[in-house]
């Protein structure tokens, strides 16, 4: 068996399946896609000769609805609860030796009850793998990492990935803590966007103290709060009121205005937007900001409809890129802290 395992948000398996299918077709690769709603993952089975290409081109950062992508090695069903280890050892590829082991389960109603089993099984499997020469004694991030994903007590997927090519969090979920002083939970969305959509080098270069940013539809101020923690000067646009702690902050200027109509008096380094509005309207307005040179970098959310979400996502991003005109770096992801939405990062490469 060969192919890809991709984790996703529960309920978005059809969107991920459609995205994988469309992108595989563009690569000229045929594959069999298995997806069941609310299971939290999708399988793409294909010819072994095509797996490396898929892993390179369908990198987790490039896929919108995937939290993690793995090389699929085996699917084991009807495992005996008294000895799950022997069949797993037998099903592993002869090479390589793995540098780390993650025991996982889908982030779904079906998968979450397996968390306890995953913890205990990892403690049992790890020493056996080391004794068999299949797992390094010490962590080796540069070696492939073995993933054992429990779908039930007797049903397991075996996969692997290289650390440099994968999401650095188990289940593809960054564990962020909402601080008491955060104005709203939406702060977690922007925090996750910054660590998911930008590399560490990009964050260092593009989020420098003293830079200027605009937060459209800012109230109550969750995204503004994240930006000032990066020491950016923020103009917060909203007719509603910000939290008092932000109103009195020296890095914050609150302007009572409609976020869709307001224009900056001078170019900004950043613009962020988490307004509840039709996704096509948001995409078009965001394109104006780049086309007019009002900002260089932006992060915004697109609230998706209940149906045809992949089609709407593709349409909005194509419309945004076309109308922005300028050469772009464009990345989008459905984040763990998103709901029925995706988060988009765009940067003007001409400036």
Curated annotation (Swiss-Prot):
Principal localization?
A: cytoplasm
List residues traversing the bilayer. Answer: none
Please tell me the species this chain comes from.
Answer: Xylella fastidiosa (strain 9a5c)
Q: How does it assemble?
A: Monomer.
Its family remark reads: Belongs to the class I-like SAM-binding methyltransferase superfamily. RNA methyltransferase RlmE family. RlmM subfamily.
Q: What does this protein do?
A: Catalyzes the 2'-O-methylation at nucleotide C2498 in 23S rRNA.
**Can you tell me which residues bind S-adenosyl-L-methionine?**
186, 219-222, 238, 258, 274
Q: Which GO terms describe its biological process?
A: methylation; rRNA processing
Query: What molecular functions are annotated in GO for this chain?
Result: S-adenosylmethionine-dependent methyltransferase activity
Name where it's found: Cytoplasm
Q: Which reaction does it catalyse?
A: cytidine(2498) in 23S rRNA + S-adenosyl-L-methionine = 2'-O-methylcytidine(2498) in 23S rRNA + S-adenosyl-L-homocysteine + H(+)
Protein's UniProt name? Ribosomal RNA large subunit methyltransferase M
**Entry-linked Pfam families:** FtsJ, RlmM_FDX, RLMM_N
Query: Which InterPro entries does the record associate with it?
Result: RlmM_FDX, RlmM_THUMP-like, RNA_MeTrfase_FtsJ_dom, rRNA_MeTrfase_M, SAM-dependent_MTases_sf
Q: Sorted alphabetically, which keywords does the UniProt record give?
A: Cytoplasm, Methyltransferase, rRNA processing, S-adenosyl-L-methionine, Transferase
Quote the EC number. 2.1.1.186
Residue spans making up a coiled coil are none
Gene Ontology cellular-component terms for this entry are:
cytoplasm
């Amino acid at each position: 068996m060969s192919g890809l395992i991709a984790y996703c948000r529960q309920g978005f398996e059809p969107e991920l399946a459609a995205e994988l299918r469309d992108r595989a077709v563009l690569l000229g690769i045929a594959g069999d896609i298995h997806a069941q709603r609310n299971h939290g993952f999708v399988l793409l089975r294909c010819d072994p000769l095509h797996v490396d290409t898929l892993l390179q081109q369908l990198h987790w950062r490039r896929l919108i609805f995937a939290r993690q992508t793995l090389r699929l090695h085996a699917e084991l069903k009807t495992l005996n609860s008294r000895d799950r280890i022997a069949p797993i050892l037998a099903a592993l590829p002869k090479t390589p030796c793995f540098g780390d082991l993650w025991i996982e389960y889908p982030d779904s109603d079906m998968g979450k009850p397996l968390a306890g089993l995953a913890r205990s099984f990892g403690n049992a499997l790890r020493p056996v793998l080391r004794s068999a020469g299949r797992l390094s004694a010490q962590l080796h991030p540069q070696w492939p990492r073995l993933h054992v994903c429990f779908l039930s007590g007797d049903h397991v997927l075996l996969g692997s990935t290289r650390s440099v090519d994968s999401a650095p969090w188990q289940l593809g979920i960054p564990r962020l803590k909402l601080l008491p002083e955060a104005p709203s939970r939406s702060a977690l969305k922007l925090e996750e966007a910054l660590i998911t959509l930008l590399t560490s080098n990009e964050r260092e270069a593009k989020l420098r103290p003293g830079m200027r940013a605009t937060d459209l539809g800012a109230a109550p101020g969750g995204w503004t709060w994240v930006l000032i923690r990066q020491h950016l000067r923020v103009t917060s646009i909203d007719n509603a009121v910000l939290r008092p702690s932000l109103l009195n902050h020296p890095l914050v200027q609150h302007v009572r205005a409609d976020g869709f109509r307001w224009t900056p008096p001078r170019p900004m380094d950043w613009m962020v937007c988490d307004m509840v509005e039709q996704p096509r309207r948001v995409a078009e307005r965001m394109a104006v900001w780049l086309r007019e040179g009002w900002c260089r970098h932006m992060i915004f959310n697109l609230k998706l409809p209940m149906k045809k979400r992949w089609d709407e996502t593709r349409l909005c991003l194509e419309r945004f890129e076309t109308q922005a005109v300028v050469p772009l770096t464009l990345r989008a992801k459905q984040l763990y802290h998103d709901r029925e939405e995706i988060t988009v990062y765009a940067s003007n490469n001409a400036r």
